[in-house]
Design a protein with these regions (language model features):
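Short glycine-aspartate micro-motif
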Residues: 5-7, 85-89, 144, 204-208
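Short, compositionally biased segments
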Residues: 215-224, 229-232, 243, 250
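Short linear motifs in low-complexity or flexible loops
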Residues: 231, 240, 246-247, 252-256, ...
Length: 263
């Protein structure tokens, strides 16, 4: 029996999934769930063996959606009992300063991913929920979190640090984190073969272009900055992370950030 990994990407109102052959890396089956929790019929799509199966019905939450996904495997193939699933991988946008590499899904790591939703409010919550649901549906299969931000974990301080009060930055874990790291890691790993040059010493500028887009030089997204004047580069999400009220924002932006005027 082939060994496979079921990859889950849980969004705020959607789920994408793919069953991947562990040895060849080939996608065997895939699909998506859309419009979760919306006041209209949701949409399911499951593809296997060249055939596409679709269904529309209300989808109240991620648990309902994932239960239906597992039902599609048994109804349209490959059957779960024959699929050889040895692990379930969950893509997570933000691992913060906690996760430098993939981590086993446990009660502790689920709670940590939820806590990091302050840095990725649209992503981490649904991703943690997807892992919780899949643990309950496939309790005997190991579940793994894979973090987009891990690819950028070792950024040098000069690339990851803001011109921001250090106390505020440390308290609220504000730094440049990077996004789409799994995509950047894959692209940068195959480029040497494509161009016929050794990976060591090969300089790359990597672009991820999808529903979101980013570039990895050091990188250019996720707690990244818009150009400002008085305070230098300031990224608007830092305001939401700190939940500052307007007077505090004005003080921070005008007096506490960036280079200070002297003399």
């Amino acid at each position: 029996m082939a060994k496979t990994v079921l990859v889950i990407n849980s969004g705020s109102s959607s789920i994408k999934y793919q069953l991947v052959d562990l040895e060849s890396g080939e996608g065997l089956a895939s699909g998506l769930v859309e419009k979760i929790g919306e006041p209209v019929d949701g949409h399911y799509k499951h593809e296997y063996n060249g055939e596409k199966h679709e269904l529309e019905e209300p989808i109240h939450d991620h648990e309902q959606g994932l239960k239906r996904v597992l039902g599609f495997f048994d109804e349209f193939g490959p059957k779960l009992a024959d699929a050889g699933i040895v692990a379930v991988g969950h893509r997570v946008v933000q691992g913060g300063s906690i996760f430098p590499k993939p981590a086993l899904v446990t009660n502790k790591t689920i709670n940590q991913v939820k806590d990091l939703a302050v840095l990725a409010p649209l992503h981490n919550g649904p991703e943690a929920k997807g892992a919780e649901v899949m643990r309950s549906l496939l309790p005997d299969v190991p579940q793994i979190f894979v973090f987009d931000s891990s690819f950028f974990f070792q950024l040098p301080k000069v690339a990851s640090t803001y011109a921001l009060n250090k106390e505020i930055a440390d308290q609220y874990h504000i730094r440049r984190y990077g996004a789409h790291g799994t995509s950047h890691e894959y692209i940068s790993s195959v480029v040497p073969d494509v161009v016929g040059k050794p990976a060591e010493g090969l300089k790359q500028i990597v672009l991820h272009i999808g529903n979101g887009a980013s570039q990895a030089v050091d990188h250019a997204v996720f707690l990244q900055c818009d150009d400002g004047g008085n305070a230098g580069g300031v990224f608007q999400h830092k305001v939401f992370v700190k939940r500052l009220q307007a007077p505090h924002v004005r003080h921070a932006h005008g007096q506490a950030l960036g280079l200070k005027q002297t003399g």
